[in-house]
């Protein structure tokens, strides 16, 4: 069947993911390969002490991203889609969107990037003997209650970004179990009922009488087919009126779940590292962790299997800022360099730097970094007077810095918990320049790192796969579907740690840890 016919006969599957700086849509056909895409750039705002996006930002971004996708389809295939086999929505996990009974947003959306819930996160973690990070939705809700915020008495529902968009498209307040695991702790089928009971008692004692099961979105596993695009939802996504209602929507998932799906990392002893504006590693566990740690989140795969996640708020933003500086210099010189070529030039040059970066250390903290103990962000760098300061070492240190805080958390899993992993797959923008960040990550973690041909597709492709699984999965588990239908014969490259690189990265980390006190002082 020609691709035009597939588009017209609902043999295509659409994934849309709301990342920190880009909203991306990827369309796949029944071979599960991307055939079209569209994107929309956006940025969070820092307003009144809160990192946020407005509802207008969200709606406009969704519509412009979808319009870019349909234009790409028209340009390539000469048709405009009126339907799809299924649609899936993904977004940055966690955060806090609180609504009243009439669906009015009560306070501006508080994104995952905020580190303003320390008291709530600490008290909940102690109550449950389970790490509740500051960015989780339940921490935001409890902190608002502790703060005595006026809006709390009006709360009827809270949601995440992906859950909110799914609700606008379908009228259903539901999320996938992976997304749910960043709202409140889950077990294999839904929210942990023992924990719900304990937290309900605490919230009630603080004057919040609504039960959490009424406030939180319901939970579904991958493959569930319980929501469909409404007429209002179709008009929201496509104001031209071309898109018709009735398309199935799979459970909305977070960027962790789509990353696992996009890297075929949903079975125990597999893992992946997603690296963009933030960076996080996810290792699917074959046994529960013995302890709980502020640096380690326990979330789940889209099927509910437990996952240890090390999440760091900061990854590529500071690196991007330095690339921009050199782009400005090139422009001033009268020899402008295209952005992709500039990235490649600087990344590949970093490979020629000293393994320890010549005693140059970079902190890439634009916002707080709890894994490294940094409450607030202050990008900074330092070097020793006898160090070797040059462009290659500066950029090598910049790239090392994108994964240094991650390394602190991963050491807990590998050394204290003896977690074993058979493969780690990297994906996201940091890996677009072949063999650079991939090699540094292998050196830093001391294990092989693979990057697939689809690494740049990232979460939107993973979300499209989850949408396809809803329709095409049949009786297969998600891992069986991915292994037999999607990743069979997938082209990938694997790099092993190099001795010099690993030793140099270890030296960089010693300097990094020694300098953290200066980072803390600068942020006060």
Language-model features, listed with the residues they occupy:
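N-terminal glycine/serine-rich phosphate-binding loop of ATP-dependent small-molecule kinases
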Residues: 1-108, 122-123, 154, 235, ...
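Gly/Ser/Thr-rich active-site cleft segment
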Residues: 18-20, 129-253, 363-364, 395, ...
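Glycine-rich phosphate-binding loops at beta-strand->alpha-helix junctions
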Residues: 22, 219-229, 253, 277-279, ...
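Phosphate/ATP-binding catalytic cores across multiple sugar-kinase/actin-like superfamilies
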Residues: 64-72, 256, 394-422, 470, ...
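Glycine-rich phosphate-binding loop of actin/hexokinase-like ATP-binding domains
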Residues: 96-122, 132, 155, 159-197, ...
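Glycine-rich phosphate-binding/hydrolytic loop that grips phosphoryl groups
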Residues: 254, 258-262, 310-323, 396, ...
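Acidic, glycine/GT-rich loop-and beta-edge segments that sit at the periphery of enzyme/chaperone cores
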Residues: 312, 317-320, 324-332, 336, ...
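Activation-segment/catalytic-loop signature of the eukaryotic protein kinase fold
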Residues: 352-453
């Amino acid at each position: 069947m020609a691709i035009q016919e597939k588009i017209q006969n609902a043999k295509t599957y659409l994934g849309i993911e709301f990342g920190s700086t880009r909203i991306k849509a990827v369309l796949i056909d029944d071979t599960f390969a991307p055939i079209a895409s569209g994107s929309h750039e956006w940025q969070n705002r820092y307003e009144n002490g809160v990192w946020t996006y407005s509802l207008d930002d969200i709606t406009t971004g969704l519509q412009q991203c979808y319009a870019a996708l349909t234009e790409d389809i028209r340009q390539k295939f000469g048709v405009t889609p009126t339907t799809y086999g299924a649609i899936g929505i993904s977004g940055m996990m966690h955060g806090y969107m609180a609504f009243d009974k009439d669906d009015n947003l009560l306070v501006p959306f508080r994104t995952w990037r905020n580190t303003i819930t320390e008291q709530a996160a600490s008290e909940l973690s102690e109550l449950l003997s389970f790490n509740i990070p500051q960015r989780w939705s339940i921490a935001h809700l409890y902190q608002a209650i502790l703060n005595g915020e006026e809006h709390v008495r009006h709360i009827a529902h809270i949601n995440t970004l992906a859950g909110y968009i799914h609700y606008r498209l379908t009228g259903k307040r539901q999320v996938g179990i992976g997304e749910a695991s960043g709202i409140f702790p889950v077990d294999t089928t839904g929210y942990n009922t023992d924990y719900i009971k304990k937290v309900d008692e605490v919230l009630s004692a603080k004057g919040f009488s609504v039960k959490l099961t009424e406030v939180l979105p319901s939970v579904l596993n991958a493959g569930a087919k319980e929501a469909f695009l409404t007429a209002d939802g179709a008009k929201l996504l496509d104001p031209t009126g071309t898109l018709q209602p009735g398309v199935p929507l799979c459970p909305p998932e977070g960027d962790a779940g789509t990353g696992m799906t996009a890297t075929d990392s949903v079975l125990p002893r597999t893992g992946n590292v997603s690296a963009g504006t933030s960076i996080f590693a996810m290792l699917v566990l074959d046994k529960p962790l013995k302890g709980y740690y502020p640096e380690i989140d326990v979330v789940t795969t889209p099927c509910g299997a437990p996952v240890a996640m090390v999440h760091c708020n900061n990854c590529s933003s500071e690196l991007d800022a330095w690339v921009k500086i050199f782009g400005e210099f090139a422009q001033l010189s009268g020899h402008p360099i295209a952005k992709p070529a500039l990235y490649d030039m600087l990344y590949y040059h970093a490979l020629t730097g000293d393994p320890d970066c010549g005693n140059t250390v970079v902190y890439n903290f634009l916002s707080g970094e709890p894994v490294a103990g940094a409450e607030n962000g202050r990008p900074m760098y330092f070097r020793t007077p006898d160090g070797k300061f040059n462009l290659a070492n500066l950029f090598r240190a910049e790239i090392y810095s994108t994964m240094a805080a991650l390394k602190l958390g991963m050491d807990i899993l590998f050394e204290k918990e003896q977690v074993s992993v058979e493969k780690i797959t990297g994906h996201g923008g940091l890996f677009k320049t072949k063999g650079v960040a991939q090699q540094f990550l292998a050196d830093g973690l001391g294990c092989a790192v693979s990057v697939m041909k689809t690494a740049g597709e990232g979460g939107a492709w993973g979300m499209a796969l989850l949408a396809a699984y809803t329709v095409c999965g049949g009786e297969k588990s998600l891992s069986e579907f991915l292994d037999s239908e999607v990743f069979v014969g997938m082209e990938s490259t694997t790099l092993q740690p190099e001795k010099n690189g690993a030793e140099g990265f270890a030296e960089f980390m010693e300097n990094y840890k020694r300098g953290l006190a200066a980072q803390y002082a600068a942020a006060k």
